Amino acid sequence: MNKPILHKKTFQELTTDELYELLRVRSEVFVVEQNCVYQDLDGDDQNSIHLWLTLGNRIVALARVCPVGTHMKEVSIGRVITTVRGKGYGKQIMIHSIETAIKHFGATHIDIEAQEYAKGFYENRIQTVVR
């Protein structure tokens, strides 16, 4: 099986097509699949670093990393999505997101925004990543 390709860009570096595809996937998963009705376009994307994994032309996971004081008090990771489950892409995107939070924003503490049902996923993964 092919290994997914990591993409990492600031909002300003995103092409129009990339931005559209990221927002389309977020809407498809959060609004349509999970029935989470909230304002996805919250004004924080412009200051964030966007990460996504692709296999071919398909996004299999994505996340955004927000600097201190943008979305939460601390550096934060949110809008985490996997479109293909059971392949470890969620863990991969979280590892890359944590590395990005530390490298680009100097994070020593990271807030993770998650829906209630997903908190166990993050708690289990974070302990294996951050020691």
Where do the PLM segments sit?
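Conserved acetyl-CoA pyrophosphate-binding loop and the N-cap/start of the following alpha-helix
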Residues: V84-S97
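Residue-level recognition of the GNAT/N-acetyltransferase active site
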Residues: I81-R85, E113-Q115
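A conserved beta-turn-beta hairpin within the catalytic core of GNAT-like acetyltransferases
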Residues: P67-I77, R85, H104-T108
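Conserved beta-strand in the GNAT
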Residues: W52, R58-P67, E74-I81
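Short amphipathic alpha-helix that is part of the acyltransferase structural core
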Residues: M1-N47, L55-R58
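Conserved GNAT acetyl-CoA-binding A-motif
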Residues: A101-Q115
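Conserved active-site alpha-helix within GNAT-family acetyltransferase domains
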Residues: H109, E116-R131
